[in-house]
């Protein structure tokens, strides 16, 4: 079983007991966190796709540690001008471990949504099938008389 979940603005494919580095979360080390924005859920071939998220589905995780990523060097240079600029950046990260994926009501909600969409489509067909107002007869064309 795996899920595609949005964590801190990024999408991750996660499964149980997977360790993931995400952008810094405000939670303390050792605390549990739940992510409700599950975009896709695969339960042994049974795929549930959210529009945009699956209602009732969640991913539970535990915060392991807060750390900084490797330094990324930003180097700018203009040739023949003597311009060189060197900057560095270290991203603040949080390491989490996925403890479980909950799909409570995910498939039921999706089936209910499909039924509602089908009912709406049937209602629009009934409206379209209603008799339309008669249009005015087209104007008669004047015949060219030859003299």
Curated annotation (Swiss-Prot):
Disulfide bonds: none annotated. Residues 125-147 are annotated as: Disordered. Pfam families: Ribosomal_L21p. Keywords: Ribonucleoprotein, Ribosomal protein, RNA-binding, rRNA-binding. PROSITE patterns: RIBOSOMAL_L21. One of its GO terms (cellular component) is ribosome. It comes from the Bacteria. GO terms for biological process: translation. GO terms for molecular function: rRNA binding; structural constituent of ribosome. SUPFAM superfamilies: L21p-like (SSF141091). Transmembrane segments: none annotated. Belongs to the bacterial ribosomal protein bL21 family. Part of the 50S ribosomal subunit. Contacts protein L20. This protein binds to 23S rRNA in the presence of protein L20. This is Large ribosomal subunit protein bL21.
């Amino acid at each position: 079983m795996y899920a595609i979940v949005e964590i801190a603005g990024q999408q991750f494919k996660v499964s149980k007991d997977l360790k993931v580095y995400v952008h810094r979360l405000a939670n303390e080390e050792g605390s549990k966190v739940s992510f409700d924005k599950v975009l896709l859920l695969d339960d042994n071939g049974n795929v549930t796709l959210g529009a945009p998220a699956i209602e009732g589905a969640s991913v539970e995780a535990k915060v392991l540690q807060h750390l900084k990523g490797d330094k990324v060097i930003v180097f700018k240079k203009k040739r023949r001008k003597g311009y060189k600029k060197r900057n560095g950046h270290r991203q603040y990260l949080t390491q989490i471990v996925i403890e479980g994926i909950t799909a409570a009501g995910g498939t039921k909600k999706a089936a209910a949504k499909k039924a509602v969409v089908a009912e709406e489509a049937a209602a629009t067909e009934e409206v379209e099938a209603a008799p339309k107002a008669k249009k005015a007869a087209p104007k008669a064309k004047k015949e060219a008389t030859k003299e």
